[in-house]
Amino acid sequence: MSGRNNNKLPSNLPQLQNLIKRDPPAYVEEFLQQYNHYKSNMEIFKLQPNKPSKELAELVMFMAQIGHCYPEHLSEFPQELKDLLSYNHTVLDPDLRMTFCKALILLRNKNLINPSDLLELFFELLRCRDKLLRKTLYTHIVTDIKNINAKHKNNKVNVVLQNFMYTMLRDSNATAAKMSLDVMIELYRRNIWNDAKTVNVITTACFSKITKILVAALTFFLGKDEEEKQDSDSESEDDGPTARDLLVQYATGKKGSKNKKKLEKAMKVLKKQKKKKKPEVFNFSAIHLIHDPQDFAEKLLKQLESCKERFEVKMMLMNLISRLVGIHELFLFNFYPFVQRFLQPHQREVTKILLFAAQASHHLVPPEIIQSLLLTVANNFVTDKNSGEVMTVGINAIKEITARCPLAMTEELLQDLAQYKTHKDKNVMMSARTLIHLFRTLNPQMLQKKFRGKPTEASIEARIQEYGELDAKDYIPGAEVLELEKEENTENDEDGWESASLSEEEEDGEWVDVHHSSDEEQQAVAKKLDSMPMEERKAKAAAVSTSRVLTQDDFQKIRMAQMKKEMDAAPGKAQKRKYLDMDSDEESRGELLSLRDIERLHKKPKSDKETRLATAMAGRTDRKEFVRKKTKINPFSSSTNKEKKKQKNFMMMRYSQNVRSKTSRSFREKQLALRDALLKKRKRMK
């Protein structure tokens, strides 16, 4: 009889639910019976909404499951649940409140509820002190908005929700405001709400008095797009000669130290050219979408000056302000004196503050403002009373600042810093060399003659711009080589950067010279270019740029010619006997600035004894013990009497005759044993 009772439909809701989904018209009467039962339970529940009701929870889920089968009967069911949650969500039983929310989510997934009204209700429910409920609502909100914008951007719904979230960010309940901010950040990262309105709503959270909201907003703006994390070494076929081409050229030619040096130098120049095509500093799209970055940065600076938060929060504010100034090239002159107050070697996280100073430097800042910053760094860090690491950090910071604002460097300060090229500390010496190397490309005339090095074509053409000057060219630099090659009919000859593949065979078996072609006609072309004045070169380049449509091959030739300028000596000068073996990361400026650029030490400091011991012990964790364990002939045999005697409890042995009659060693025996032990130890030490 028990099996039959389980099949009775009025009392078996799961079975009735299954049958209704299969054939809704056949079970209308059973449904109406349960619906009336639900109404009566709901009326009773409204009298005491703070009491749990398991029967009501089952009926609500039953109605939500079959809501699509009888839409005309259950048209008021979703609104009734929403009203109940809206008015009584603070007093409802947690399990019953979760059931009501799950029922609404189920109805929304079946598209029986308007998304705007439901999501607004769920945002209000984020005020509840129920962590599991908040997590469930957060997941549904993000997923639902993602599904709404799956096929196309639903601007009508998005605008309503964004306006509502803007009010939620100013809500008195910190938890609800924080969850609303998390929703917007998550939707932006998923490229669902990646518009300017979302970003500017998040900017308002940067001025919140609630620390958690402030930190979340600052962390969002200090992040990076996932696209930037891709490997920067990816190369395309149209980007000129690749590293693979150079390696193939070396592999198919003669092996020798000369060709090996040529390969290394060519690889360095190639890597430098590749880095020039990388995105600029702080390429995070959210910062670019801010409507008024100048006003935003000024408000942040005002907040920073009166901020009473922890030091870490102040550092985040400084970081964001410096990024805003660096990206948008803002005029925020009060920021630099504020940063100068913290530029002391003993200051906590001083390397990060130096990084912020470099980030906030750009060519539109008046040079006298940056000069004050440079002098502060030089006076506080680059002095002989400080350690080598402190001096290195100071020179590195000066180098990064002047790379972004070259006019700020004075000739007197540069010559003083260049003298550290012969410093006894290797880190200081190498940092000074990198600074000299930087100004060889920016403005060699500021260096003393002995520090300028052998001039190249690129260094001769280099000219430092005046304050506010724009270098707008009406021609493609290097385009003059195209017309010359056309005149000399050297279509089949490359000018020193012959591309090679695995299928090519060289007649003489030698590696192609990457510096200059040995062909007589190419030498004649090079001589014509060398003898041509700079103004005539520009005129020819402008004529070529405007008179012909350049192909990919033409652009590749131009790139190769520009790369040759950085490798070859200037006209009338001898080739360099050797090139300075600089770190490849030092060769390109204006790229992504990281803390490693400020803290770079070319020679690692010696670690103390504790660090060495910790490293040694960490390496021994996976090593097996070098102790041979005694093995039995028969592993299943019992233990011997000797083993049993060793393992026996002392309390069982203390009254034994052997223990009581045991005699200890005499003083003489102990002396002899100690002597033998010391002799044995001395032999091991030898």
From Swiss-Prot:
Source organism, top-level taxon: Eukaryota
Tell me which Gene Ontology terms the entry assigns under biological process: cellular response to leukemia inhibitory factor; protein transport; ribosomal large subunit biogenesis; ribosomal large subunit export from nucleus
Which residue positions does the secretion signal occupy?
A: none
Region entry Disordered, spans: 484-508, 563-586, 604-649
Q: Which Pfam families match?
A: SDA1_C, SDA1_dom, SDA1_HEAT
Q: What is its main location?
A: nucleus
Q: Where does it localize?
A: Nucleus, Nucleolus
Q: Which family does it belong to?
A: Belongs to the SDA1 family.
Q: Which residues carry this modification: Phosphothreonine?
A: T551
Keywords for the protein's UniProt record, in alphabetical order: Coiled coil, Nucleus, Phosphoprotein, Protein transport, Ribosome biogenesis, Transport
Protein's UniProt name? Protein SDA1 homolog
Compositional bias per record (Acidic residues), positions renumbered to this chain: 490-508
Which positions does the record annotate as the modified residue Phosphoserine? S232, S234, S236, S584, S588, S594
The UniProt entry's coiled-coil ranges are 254-315
Q: What does this protein do?
A: Required for 60S pre-ribosomal subunits export to the cytoplasm.
Q: Which organism is it from?
A: Rattus norvegicus
Entry GO CC: nucleolus
